A protein has these predicted regions:
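Extracellular beta-rich repeat passengers
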Residues: 1-223, 230, 244-246
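Functionally critical loop-and-helix segments that line ligand-binding/catalytic clefts
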Residues: 224-238
């Protein structure tokens, strides 16, 4: 209503049987903390395709989606045009895919990730495709130790046109849980100077000479528009498109 999504305050989504498509669209999904995971798949009662589109999802103690069963048969997980805030602060990360009978693709696109704990994804199954593109990542108070934990290398992986930013709770960050430099590129991505990189660098990313406070209008309060006087090269190209100048 009037550009404001209705608030859905809840514990978790539960599936009592296998189902087809499950779509969450244009909702402000607020976890009440009653469950560690917004969606937890521990058996064959699973979706075929799931998507979050145009949503705000916030205050989930662990993951938005956790899959941990070889009986789970799924095709895709898609998160698009969402703001994801205060997720995974108790561990496990934004997405946690430990086991699955089948899962072909995961995409996170055109999103803002704001205060994310542990990792963006913990992936331990073989995917055909993983995409993380046009996202703005900002951690101010939260220290994320690594962006991605990819125990299984996807057949195709794309991480591009993203901005990784913020002081990260004063902690250093690795691009991955292990050395993925032989097959993982961050080409087209930017890293602000206040995000201090540990031993595993963001391969092919552009390291900026200025901080997130220099780049964004008011990042600590969720305004990730670029400061116009900066004339940032990534304007209209990198990060969540909602923050680009019209």
């Amino acid at each position: 209503v009037n550009g404001i999504n209705p608030v859905l305050e809840m514990s978790k989504f539960t599936f009592s049987a296998p189902m087809g498509n499950f779509y969450v669209q244009y909702m402000d999904v607020l976890s009440n903390g009653g469950s560690q995971f917004l969606i937890e798949i521990g058996n064959g009662n699973c979706f075929t395709n799931i998507s979050f589109t145009g949503c705000t999802v916030r205050e989930v103690p662990r993951s938005i989606i956790r899959m941990n069963s070889n009986d789970a048969m799924a095709e895709s997980i898609n998160i698009d045009n969402c703001i994801l805030k205060n997720i995974g602060l108790s561990g496990y990360g934004l997405l946690n895919i430990g086991k699955a009978g089948t899962l072909n693709s995961i995409s996170i696109t055109d999103c803002t990730l704001w205060e994310i704990g542990d990792q963006i994804i913990d992936l331990r199954v073989a995917l055909s495709e993983f995409e993380f593109s046009n996202c703005t990542f900002y951690n101010n108070e939260t220290g994320i130790p690594k962006m991605f934990r990819l125990e299984k290398q996807p057949k195709m992986i794309t991480i591009t046109n993203c901005i990784f930013s913020g002081p990260n709770g004063g902690s250093k960050v690795n691009s991955g849980n292990s050395d993925y430099s032989g097959w993982l590129s961050y080409a087209g991505c930017y890293v602000t100077s206040d995000m201090v990189i540990d031993s595993r660098e963001f391969n092919d990313a552009i390291s900026l000479e200025y901080t997130s406070d220099d780049l964004f209008i008011d990042p600590t309060n969720g305004d990730f528009r670029f400061k116009p006087e900066l004339k940032f090269d990534g304007e209209g190209v990198a990060g969540d498109p909602r923050w680009w100048a019209n």
